[in-house]
Amino acid sequence: MDGKSVTDWVSHEPIDEWEVMMQKVAQFHHKHNFAGKNGHDMGYRIALTVEELGELSAAITKGKPLDECAEEMADILILLMGHSIAMKVDL
């Protein structure tokens, strides 16, 4: 399951919407130097994911509007995409 690195994704020519989204996440990682600032530490990233899952759970259990729930879901999706980039796993 060899995936692309941040550099690979930044220089890659996307062929579909998924690859466009992956490239945007990689560009964000590159811009903020995640690899150099411990942003690819998976322990840290998993803790962020747990936090985001808690926010989604709270939005759902409190009956928040669907757009707020969707925002929390998007946060989790973006984090998971970033996990795959940090771990160089092809989704």
Model-assigned labels for residue ranges:
Residues 1-91:
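Flexible "arm" and connector segments at domain edges
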